Amino acid sequence: MKKFLKALVSIMLVLATGCSSKTVKTSNSTKESSAKTFDGNYYNMINNGRSKNSEKFYLNFSNTKDLVTIGSGLQILSTKHFSTNDYYLSEGLQLTPTDYNNLLKRDSAGTKEEDRKYPDTLQIESGKTYEGLQSPVLVSNITEQDYYKKSGSSYALKGISVAIILDPKEQIDGKLSSPAITLSDEKLRSYAQQCVKKAYKYIRSKKKKLADVPVMIGIYRANNNEISETNGNYIYESFCEGGSVGTLKNVNHENVYFTSTRATKLDPATASEFATIKSNLKKASTEAAGLVGQANYIDDTIQTMKITAHLNIKTYTELLYLTSVIADNINSKFTQDFNIKVLVYSQDELMAVIIKQKGEDAKTSILEQ
């Protein structure tokens, strides 16, 4: 029963943080769900099937926090161009495994131009030195999201978003170096611009039905888990349409741990308030208690925070009391209004979940037997 409740709460977390609001199955006989389950900040969904690149994408990022933030960040960037009121989101299915190979693979060093299998690659030419790096591989993967408009009972593709994921590594004796290499901002921007131009040209020329479809291209810098546990972030975006490559714009997405030096510098008020909540919890607890927060910022403004609370409770009453302390504090101490979710653990077991939606009071769910 408890496993069932945990699964139910996991679903509630997804619903509370908001990803979409409908599920629509697209097939020869399209069916649309009438139930609205998420808030209106994100997209209604249609199901056209699974991307053939999903397995490779999962293998690349399953051990990193990039697995989620690449997709969620791409949706956030897409909302500027494809309104959540008018568009439906689908798994990206326009680029095939062949397309991914053409963009991500490269010919071996010394291959004659007329013999090249991958003339459209986004990668640096094999064997070349770039920024002092030996034969680097700069793009690790690509992922896609499709955006549809509904007309009657049918759906028409009206836009796609593509994330180009940079994870620069040298290739030495056929093996990729680890950890990843850091490029200068100037070279990073120059290379990102090249990737956008090449990718958009490829999509328009090789995918004929996409020739007139707007394409939003985001450049994502993957996280290096050997340096930091925080996920990567989008650094550039370009909206391309009508055959014209859009201006490469800086993107300011950042994920920050609380408490940390970076949190104090970026958002001193919230950092101080978080420290107060943490102190109040410790004072209320008879045993060790701790809080760790991770917040998402866009343009230096906090959007969401996930808090993990580690308690050492001995009774059910103590669990109720300490979760109420946390809920009361996140209601009253934060001066900025943003979405918050709190996972409450005791002895490494999930015991409660607290959700605070922007503009609302916190709501607590206790996982009982």
Predicted regions and their residues:
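Sec-dependent signal peptide recognition
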Residues: 2-10
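Acidic, serine/threonine- and glycine-rich low-complexity intrinsically disordered segments
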Residues: 185-289, 296-298
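C-terminal motif of bacterial Sec signal peptides marking the signal peptidase cleavage site
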Residues: 15-18
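Bacterial signal peptide processing site
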Residues: 20-22
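Short edge beta-strands and adjacent turn/loop segments
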Residues: 135-170, 285-311
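Post-signal peptide N-terminal segment of secreted/secretory-pathway proteins
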Residues: 39-148
